[in-house]
Amino acid sequence: MADHNDRGRQGEEIALKHLRQQGYQIEALNWQSGRRELDIVASTSRELVVVEVKTRTEGFLLAPEEAVDARKRRLISESAHHYVRMYAIDLPVRFDVISVVLSADGSCKRIEHRENAFPLLLKRSQRSTPRRRRL
């Protein structure tokens, strides 16, 4: 398996441990439906938390969280929308990003959990209520 896949899996394990220590309930890991995928789906008593995990090795030019661009945020939003509809979840959804930086030996150098990293982004056709047009 490619090093980046191993690194990604290691970052997800570190993120899972962090979330559990913070009291989150893990609902799904690497949830997939068609081409849709969510790294981690967790929950609190008040909300569903969709977590995108980005892992890099120390010295990588791009910070992990910078890899979650507008296109990626939209895909995550669409996947979360599908997850919520599929399981009839009636909780607000929050999108977090966990950035993991590994040292050369593979140990965790830094972990950063950014809550409310971005809002729900959907295409108009996926919105449950149409927007009103101004006259």
Swiss-Prot record:
Q: Which Gene3D superfamilies match?
A: 3.40.1350.10
Any one GO molecular-function label of the UniProt entry:
nucleic acid binding
InterPro entries according to UniProt? Restrct_endonuc-II-like (IPR011335), tRNA_endonuc-like_dom_sf (IPR011856), UPF0102_YraN-like (IPR003509)
What would be one Pfam family of this protein?
UPF0102
Where would one find the signal peptide in this protein?
none
What domain of life does the UniProt record list for this protein's source?
Answer: Bacteria
Family, per the entry? Answer: Belongs to the UPF0102 family.
Q: What is this protein called?
A: UPF0102 protein PG_1874
Organism (species): Porphyromonas gingivalis (strain ATCC BAA-308 / W83)
